[in-house]
Amino acid sequence: MLLNGQISALSLDDNDNGQQHQDEVQAKHQDQGHTCPSRPSVPSLSRIYRCTPVPTIVLDASMVIIEVSNSHVALFGKPRDSLLHTSISDVSPECIPVPNIPILYGALRAACSTREIQVVEHVVVGEKIAHNLRVTPVYEDETLLFVVLEVENLRAEVINNQHAYMNETYKILVDTVKDYAIFMLDPTGHIATWNAGAGVLKGYKAEEIIGKHFSILYSPADRDNGKPARALDVCLREGRIEDEGWRYRRDGSRFWANVLITPIYQFGQHVGFVKVTRDLTERKEAEACMIAAFEESSRLKTDFLANISHEIRTPMNGMQIALTMLTDTGLSEEQREHANIVQDSMSLLLQIVNDVLDYSKLSSGSFSLHADMLDIREIVGAVVRNCRSSLQEGVELDTEISPKLPTRMRGDPLRYRQVLQNLVGNAVKFTEKGSIHVKITSSTDEEDSDSSVVRTEVTDTGIGVPDSAINTLFTPFSRFANSAARKYQGTGLGLSICKSLAELMDGSVGYSPNPNASGSVFWFTAKMGGRSVTPPSKSPSVSGSPVPTEVASEMRSIAPRKHVLLVEDNIVNHTVMLKLLHTIGFQRIDGAWNGAEAVRMVRQKPLSYDIILMDVSMPVLDGLAATEQIRDMGLTMPIIAITGNAMKGDAETYIAQGMDDCICKPVHRDQLLRVLWKWFGT
């Protein structure tokens, strides 16, 4: 009997064997007046089954083999004595034959439960000859006497007749498809069939390729690292595998292929794989062209913006330095007012240039933060001091900083200041009376207890935001305040940049109306680390608060002892930079008009110069090449890049290639003082 999927002895009504039960049944029939025909003795049955031309195994009710035919021994080559008195579950499936023992269990279970013949079809035996296994239960009344397993040889024409329609349909389908290579592999990966599409795509004729391993279609590198074999392993494990990659034709040319491999099973037995390949070379080339076009477009845009930045900043540099020196002279009130107008206009122009560059970097995804230690209180103080001069008469600007705010945190000080400066600057611009209040609070980050979330609110009593503009406040190029009259100048990029920067700092930005008066509340959050970090040994200097008076005084005493080499090709910038350095206190300043001249001067006096201020973009020899040649001399004096290039990564590139610091044009006196103090004062 089959219990829980296992073969066990079948119940014989508590008798020891089928013969005893047979005798009882015969006696019962005689007692009832029936005549029971005599049955052949076991030896007679044994001779019948042993001599039958059909390969046969006879099982008793306990599923133990009690007879094996000569024809079975001849077909399978298994000695009779090795099979007799053996449980059928201990016999190799190939000698029964069945694909596997579970299939045999199923057939025996079905035969014994239904008392009907069961057939396991198309079992491959020997030289790929298909057979059927007939499972016949022999019952007398309710008692199972025997189970007969017979192997039927299926002639080729019978199989062909059974599958003629399917084969013909498949053949027509596969052979007429020329856009796809469709072929079969045997279980070891050797090619078994080859359609017309495969011939067109791969260049092999059927007689040239059938029988060869499919790895011939892969590159030598793929064959060496075992990619074909791994593909079949994954296919068997996961049920299919799809891949894209280079495949090779007979003539050695390659094409970009999409490959799908599926395992083929027959009656639970793995018999091979079907492989479908299509040529995606045109799509791959189109994708490559699109990527190249996108990269070229991005490069051209980057180059254009870099050029625009350089071309605008270079003349602005001369204007800025000349204006700085002009304001140090004895100007009348009217002249000073005119100078302030020029200064304000230059600041606005520079802000527009910076906004366009920042927006370009943010929209392209090429913007990144620079983590460093920062002091929020110091940054807020610097921004407030910077904005006080622009306040309308009577407008108050105050701050409220939570005492729980950590003194030192880790973040990007430049970008935090940029967002804060923008929000406070907007409040100053749009508030004509009343007050502006800056509030800073912090809380522990819920996901990282070592970090803090800093919330910055700027509340004003200005003109407020109309309801129609609320949904587009943080959209690029959106301007709502008196746009027709253009009373308030700007690009409409500021708040959009603030939003992007806040999100880069793992925060957000938002707006709400002032709950206590007319005006607005703009806020942003930023995640700040709490643990200290070691700043890089070299990093580009950034503008900050005004240089203290004592620093300028100290520099004035240090400068006369220092020898400076100024390398600048623009005559205006060269002239005003020389004058600016003189106003700081430097007396020994040499000038070079290009990198080649600078290298020559350094080579003549290698130990003379204490610092080199080097323009980057120059004729004959640019600043980076000149720096490389100076470093090759073994000289380590500070080389400061003075550049109109302000794209993301420019300063880091200059430092990586041997320079020590970077100042972007237009050069402000305080910015130059800060850098010089960094290298001389400490």
UniProtKB/Swiss-Prot annotation:
Residue numbers carrying Phosphohistidine: H310
Catalytic activity: ATP + protein L-histidine = ADP + protein N-phospho-L-histidine
Residue ranges occupied by any PAC domain in the UniProt entry: 241-292
Region Disordered: start-end pairs: 11-41
Enzyme class: transferase
NCBIfam families documented for this protein: sensory_box (TIGR00229)
Protein name: Two-component system protein A
Protein species of origin: Emericella nidulans (strain FGSC A4 / ATCC 38163 / CBS 112.46 / NRRL 194 / M139)
